[in-house]
Every structure is written in structure tokens, then in C-alpha cells.
From Swiss-Prot:
NCBIfam families: PRK11727.1 (NF008725). It comes from Methylobacillus flagellatus (strain ATCC 51484 / DSM 6875 / VKM B-1610 / KT). GO terms for cellular component: cytoplasm. The gene is rlmF. One of its GO terms (molecular function) is 23S rRNA (adenine(1618)-N(6))-methyltransferase activity. Disulfide bonds: none annotated. It catalyses: adenosine(1618) in 23S rRNA + S-adenosyl-L-methionine = N(6)-methyladenosine(1618) in 23S rRNA + S-adenosyl-L-homocysteine + H(+). Keywords: Cytoplasm, Methyltransferase, rRNA processing, S-adenosyl-L-methionine, Transferase. The keyword rRNA processing applies. Gene3D superfamilies: Vaccinia Virus protein VP39 (3.40.50.150). This is Ribosomal RNA large subunit methyltransferase F. It is found in: Cytoplasm. Specifically methylates the adenine in position 1618 of 23S rRNA. GO terms for biological process: rRNA base methylation. Pfam families: Methyltransf_10.
Length: 336
């Protein structure tokens, strides 16, 4: 086997991200012994798992959530999205920085900070990390009843989450904020990881590209055996290494979803300090900025993020001017 020198830290991750270091599999197995069944030496003689194995990835997530966030019970149903924890944590930490920038550099902690997670999914990872790291109160929304039932099960199985995370069903699949944001409530942040693709065919093509990348990274040829593995993994509704249709694609894809979100945000602009959304494709940004100009957002920020060679970013916008942001802070963050 060949050997290579690996950096101690993963490049690009936020300084407060608990996952900047390479995975300590001995520590993770100690926290969650079932992970041991999936740990093996890769071609570089480093401990790892097979990231193409959905059960291995889910078990790694269970270990990470238990070891670093004290989540004793976490699971997702088959065919739901199993998110990478380090990248999800980065978004949360960057949101904390966004709030701190408007609070004289002081990080707002505690349940006075309210966050709306659009499309929280069955995994509930954003609210878990945000609550455990900063004590924030979360409202998670989704159009999928099964996803919310599973998320509610996670809350119920982990007493520390009770009272800090509430879940709401979005009954209108074409709406984002309408129907879930109540008239009298306010949010300091909204966050969202929007569907990436515009169709099932595009989602399947994206999955094929991921499989090809994984095979290359594992040193495997792209021949008959690889096609046979793909055929087995792609059976049924398994797309993109897990994910329900609404998690992976929607009308208009990422650009269409974000454009609808921006248009709706204007109607509840007084009730939220900062709206934010991940933007996976840099090519989507011009359309996002056009939509924001159309609703006359007061301020727009684009925050770049990276995990190794994977580049991403989120866009944040507010309808509150500078005086309005100061008034918001005085009114809602006095005890933060």
C-alpha cells in the first residue's frame, strides 16, 4: 500500500468547528462502539470508513453527534438525506459570526436567539448543532410528515433538546415562510439548505458524478465491477447517497427555490433580522442578487465557506436598516 502525509487539520473549516481535525476513530468508537464494524484501513493505511456505504456514514454521524454534542439517540429512516456533520457545523458557526458582527463582536448565546430552519429534514442536524453550541431556540419546518415525525423522535429521545426545538409542517409545498411563520413571532435568523437539482434526472446525473468521484478516490477502476456496484446502490429511490425527492430537487432547482424564498421574505421582513440560504452553485449567485434587488433588501452579505476542495457559500439579507438593527439588538438581546 502507498502512504501519504496528511495534514492534521481539514482545510477551510471554521475555527470553532469541532471537526477541524481528522476523524479520531479510536475516540469515536469509544463513544459509539457500533462504529468499529465499519472502520478499516484505506489504501493509504489510514483508519477510515467506506463513505459509499450508507450504513457506515450513518453510524459515523451517530458517533460524531454522541461524542461531540451529547446526542445519545439519533437515527434517520432509509432513503432520507444523511448529511456530513462538519459542513453543517460550519454554516451554524458562520451564522453566529453574522450575529456577532451586529452585536459589537459579542456572540449571542441562549434561547433568546430564535432560528428558523427551512427544510429541517429527518436528521435535524442544524438545530442540534445550533442548540448544543450556542443554546439557540429553533423552529424547524418541512413538507414531509415522516421527516418531522423522525425529527420529533430525536427531540423526545434527547432530553436536552426538549423545549429548545419545535417542529412545524409546511402544508403548502410551494410556500417557504407563508403558513409557518406566525404573525406575532420574530426570528433572529433563518437558514436553509435548498434542493440542488431541478429534476429527478438531474439528481440521478449528480449521483453518478459522485459515484465516479468516490471510485476514483478509492483507487478503483471504472469498469464492469464498478457499474455493478452502482446498479445495486442506485436501486429504488436511492439518489445522491440518500435523500427524498423534496430534499434533492424542485421546480426551478436551487435558483428557483431561492428566488421564491427571497420573494416571500419581503412579506415577513419586519419579523426577521437576517434571512440566509446556502447557495451551492456559484452560477446561481447573479440570479440571487437580482431577486434581492427586486425586493429592495437593505443589506446583502455573501459568506464563503470551504471544506477541503469543496467550495460553498451562503447569502444573507436583511430589510432592517442600521438603526433598525440596533433597535432589534436592544429589544431582543438584552440578556444574551
Amino acid at each position: 500500500m502507498s502512504q501519504r502525509s496528511l495534514p492534521d487539520e481539514k482545510s477551510g473549516l471554521h475555527p470553532r468547528n469541532r471537526h477541524r481535525q481528522r476523524y479520531d476513530f479510536a475516540l469515536l468508537v469509544e463513544a459509539h462502539p457500533p462504529l468499529a464494524a465499519f472502520v478499516r484501513l484505506n489504501q493509504y493505511e489510514d483508519a477510515s470508513i467506506d463513505f459509499a456505504d450508507a450504513q457506515a456514514v450513518k453510524t459515523l454521524n451517530q458517533a460524531l453527534l454522541k461524542c461531540y454534542y451529547g446526542i445519545a439517540a439519533w437515527d434517520i429512516p432509509p432513503q432520507f438525506l444523511c448529511p456530513p456533520i462538519p459542513g453543517r457545523a460550519d454554516y451554524v458557526h458562520c451564522l453566529a459570526d453574522l450575529l456577532a458582527a451586529g452585536n459589537d463582536g459579542n456572540m449571542p448565546y441562549g434561547g433568546n436567539v430564535r432560528v428558523l430552519d427551512i427544510g429541517t429534514g429527518a436528521n435535524l442536524v442544524y438545530p442540534i448543532i445550533g442548540q448544543k453550541e450556542y443554546g439557540w431556540h429553533f423552529v424547524g419546518t418541512d413538507i414531509n410528515v415522516e421527516a418531522l415525525e423522525n425529527a420529533q423522535g430525536i427531540v423526545a429521545a434527547n432530553p436536552g433538546l426538549a423545549g429548545a426545538i419545535e417542529l412545524r409542517l409546511q402544508r403548502n409545498v410551494g410556500a417557504v415562510f407563508s403558513g409557518v411563520v406566525q404573525e406575532s413571532e420574530r426570528f433572529d435568523l433563518t437558514m436553509c439548505n435548498p434542493p440542488f437539482h431541478a429534476s429527478q434526472a438531474a439528481a440521478m446525473a449528480g449521483t453518478e458524478r459522485k459515484w465516479h468521484h468516490l471510485e476514483r478516490s478509492r483507487g478503483k477502476p471504472t469498469g464492469k465491477g464498478v457499474r455493478r456496484v452502482r446498479s445495486g446502490r442506485m436501486s429504488g429511490n436511492r439518489l445522491n447517497f440518500g435523500g427524498q425527492a423534496a430534499e434533492l430537487y424542485c421546480e426551478g432547482g436551487e435558483e428557483g427555490f431561492i428566488s421564491r424564498m427571497i420573494k416571500e421574505s419581503a412579506a415577513v421582513g419586519a419579523q426577521c433580522l437576517w434571512f440566509t440560504t446556502l447557495v451551492s452553485k456559484a452560477a446561481t449567485l447573479p440570479a440571487v442578487y437580482r431577486s434581492l434587488r427586486a425586493v429592495d433588501a437593505y443589506k446583502v452579505k455573501t459568506i464563503d465557506m470551504a471544506q477541503g476542495q469543496k467550495k460553498s457559500r451562503f447569502v444573507a439579507w436583511t430589510f432592517h436598516d442600521t438603526a433598525g438593527q440596533r433597535a432589534w439588538r436592544r429589544q431582543h438581546w438584552r440578556d444574551v
